[in-house]
Amino acid sequence: PVITTASDAVGISALDQLGWPIEGDVAGVGRAMLDGEPIGFLSEGIWPIPALPENVEVDNFGASNQLLVTDRLVDFQEGVAVLRPPSLVVGVGASRGVSADEVLELIDSLLADAQLSIYSVRHLATIDVKADEVGLIEAAKRRGWALHTYPASALAEVSVPNPSERVRAEVGTASVAEAAAIFAGGSLLVGKRKSNRDVSMATGAIARHQPRGRLAIIGLGPGARDLLTPRAKEELRRAAVIVGLDQYVEQIEDLLRPGTRLLATGLGNEEERARSAIVEAKKGYAVALIGSGDAGVYGMASPALEDFDGTFDVVGVPGITAATAAASLLGAPMGHDHCSISLSDLHTPWPIIEQRVKAAAVGDFVVSFYNPRSKGRAWQLDSALVLLAEHRPATTPVGLVRAASRSSESVTLTTLTELITTGTAAVDMFTLVVVGNSSSKFVDGQMVTPRGYDWKS
């Protein structure tokens, strides 16, 4: 059976589905959110959390229900729920043979004394020579934390309040716990402390990881909803801000959480959209930059990452490309070496495009032409086809696929000579042109390129 919850019915995810641990009056605040009651929202820093509905109001301290985002311990009262951000890094130094119990007792003590939540621990950090320390590995495993290790040369460059010359002599850095916490996290909250044992074998320190924005660059595929990947859907739901071409934003708007901020612009302006996404990610928000097909293929990934400075996290979400969608409709035209070439000279001068077409022709590649023809650019496709015809048979199969996977989808099969002769007036920017190689042929209405250059008998 399919079980539908109240949150599913109104399109608002339950609080425990926001991606982070949550404590307190989760049920009460969750009901208030669904009922549209005012909820105050207070976050220590801008964290990349998904969008929240409009009744969740920033700094509305008078509301009877409150949603907090903090790594600090708080008194849980009725009407207060607390999201735990992954903000804390625990640096650990250890002697050979330390037990997991000793490590965890130390960590729990450090957190409790500093009034910090165990649920906000992002990972453990230590020096790389301790990467095989069983006690550290087991401690991290028990709590579900990652164990990150760093070389002594990196830790030695970190300024710490409690350096030790004895430690420097042993491992090449004057600090392990504090230096690893600071190197991995940011600002030191809790200085180095030893475990409370007769013979102490562990030291620990805690740093707070500064909030970082998150940019998901998402390929929406060729257009059909069933060709949008599950990962893309998850990332769209995770975003608080969506940036994209207006028609693409409209295409996926029903998948978004209520309260998602939409930054939609018209055709063109790719660089402006990329800049907008980066600005929002640098502020600390969870941002999704969307485009058709795969974002890394003639898509938004390139302008977004061209000047990436490492100040926010980036996630790439692959999508089904126009070429692969077209190929599935044509048969198996890309069964051997193939390439894609854009015929738009908006960003690439025609002489360079022409050079690439000639190379593909000489190399006998199957060629997919993107952006083949527009109202203001009508001759490039014809020229490219003539160049290919100089190096492959007149009967070479050609497939024209327009609006693959959409309601206006159409597929036309022809040959290289026939297309050159009859003209390309029917081709537009929504069409992908696939030209076979010298061994491609039609097989009962399917365009096929064999894996080898000789057909099997």
Regions found by a protein language model. Give the residues of each.
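Conserved mixed alpha/beta catalytic, RNA-binding, or beta-rich assembly cores of soluble enzyme
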Residues: 1-24, 34-130, 207-208, 245, ...
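N-terminal glycine-rich phosphate/adenylate-binding segment common to multiple enzyme folds
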Residues: 1-60, 163-212, 286-308
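Class I SAM-dependent methyltransferase SAM-binding "motif I" and its flanking Rossmann-like core
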Residues: 4-7, 224, 296-366
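A contiguous loop/helix-start segment that scaffolds small-molecule binding in enzyme catalytic cores
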Residues: 28-31, 35-38, 43-75, 162-165, ...
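Flexible, glycine/charged-enriched surface loops at secondary-structure junctions
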Residues: 113-123, 150, 394-401
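Class I S-adenosyl-L-methionine
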Residues: 120, 137-138, 143-178, 182, ...
